[in-house]
Amino acid sequence: MYAQSEKNKGEVKQKKMEACLEAANIYASFATKEGMLPRPPYIAIGLFACELYMKALLMKRDPKGCYAHTHNLLDLFQALPALDQQKIEEACENHFSEKPLLDFLAENAEGFEKWRYDFETKEMTISHFAFLALINALRDHCKN
């Protein structure tokens, strides 16, 4: 085995990040499609898009392109640099009138897994406006 050059490592990191963003954009566009009702499949896919957006940001910010291997939205958000957290919170601010973003993330930390298996639980709720605001804030922040 040979050592990768720094240039090759950078190219691999960039390709992984771009693939992650592409997947997030596909899932987000499906989950936020006009006229869609907030049903479990759309919510699960939207929360997965949020996860991928945060992982793409973590890859972008980390010199080695590393990210946390978890579905936990709160853990991923807290792993982001403070400036990224601040910008995302500011973008969501007007849509989180009932509770702060961190509370929403804590309540939906394992949302992707829970909403995939919604038939196993009795009752699940999510603020549709907050859900859409988070997806849009993350998508917009990843463009910068």
PLM regions with names:
Residues 1-28, 32-33, 62-144:
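Long, charged low-complexity segments
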Residues 39-59:
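Short, hydrophobic, well-ordered secondary-structure elements
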Residues 32-40:
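Acidic, serine/threonine- and proline-rich low-complexity regulatory regions
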